[in-house]
């Protein structure tokens, strides 16, 4: 079990590093964010199953619901930005730029 949790924590760290490195494009940021949410889901499910917290088994499902909402809003924002500007740069979202 410890090797599995280390691998999942490493996957979260790699997704976070990808989010920090490739933050200029919206599509890569959304993919890294989904990787982070998936690793958080798997880690929370493993912790709940190993510690036998049967009353809190709704937590991973709730995390999946929020991840699905985040993905839908992110993809809608990506389509809107790419239709308006033709690019998926995050800097296009700043309306205060000249």
UniProtKB/Swiss-Prot annotation:
- The reply on keyword RNA-binding is no
Which Gene Ontology cellular-component terms appear in the entry? Answer: mitochondrial inner membrane; respiratory chain complex I
Q: Which cysteines are joined by disulfide bonds?
A: none
* GO BP: any one term: ATP synthesis coupled electron transport
The UniProt entry, under Pfam families, shows: Oxidored_q2
Q: Name one GO molecular function term.
A: NADH dehydrogenase (ubiquinone) activity
Stated membrane topology is: Multi-pass membrane protein
Q: Where are the transmembrane segments?
A: 2-22, 29-49, 61-81
- Keyword Transport in record: yes
Q: Which reaction does it catalyse?
A: a ubiquinone + NADH + 5 H(+)(in) = a ubiquinol + NAD(+) + 4 H(+)(out)
**PANTHER family under this entry?**
NADH-UBIQUINONE OXIDOREDUCTASE CHAIN 4L (PTHR11434:SF0), NADH-UBIQUINONE OXIDOREDUCTASE SUBUNIT ND4L (PTHR11434)
The protein's name in its UniProt record: NADH-ubiquinone oxidoreductase chain 4L
Task: Tell me the organism.
Answer: Microcebus sambiranensis (Sambirano mouse lemur)
